[in-house]
Amino acid sequence: FFTQGYAAAQDRLFQFEIWRRQATGTVAEILGARELKRDIGTRLFKYRGDLDRELNHYHPEGKAIIEAYVSGVNAYIKSVVNTPEKLPLPFKILGIEPQPWTAEVVISRHQGLLGNIGQELEIGRAVALIGPEKVKDLLWLHPQEPALDLDPKIDQQLLFEDLLAPYFAFRKGVQFEPRDLQPEYRTAEAISLLNQFNELSKDSLAIGSNNWVVAGSN
């Protein structure tokens, strides 16, 4: 697992750094105030339970496995920081360096499959307005009989505020702007090269994770 972490970081170091910042709520450190809402949302959804218990939930030796993986990631990061010429170009363009990972980054939920959260809130608002029984009739949830009663501890008025703004802020993809680049990478020549790359990558089949081309003779 150490080797897996090392190899993954070697192949995807910049992606790993952006993920780490998304997971730790530190994107604004490199992209400024426009990312504050994202970082606030990230920290709001941060896991605050028993970390050891969470790590071992995935596997009896989950803590050891994840810590070994993180150690591998960090070993490669250290080798890059100590050898500046190995630093991938995107870091140089932004004027940043990769930072160490922790186990918390590995189990972060910033890419969770939570697509029904909006529907859950809409149902909660409907229950607050007309009650659970009428909502069941309107939504036709048969043959099941879900319990739609709201927890009495919930302030129902708060359901009608923009509760999901922090969630959507931390879930959105990271977008870079010209002002984020170091001055030497904002020249006309650099922009021309970037535009050429964008033209090449317009084809949806031009890129892909782990794509391989094998000769027919094989």
Where are these regions (language model features)?
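Substrate-recognition/specificity elements adjacent to catalytic centers across diverse enzyme folds
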Residues: 1-218
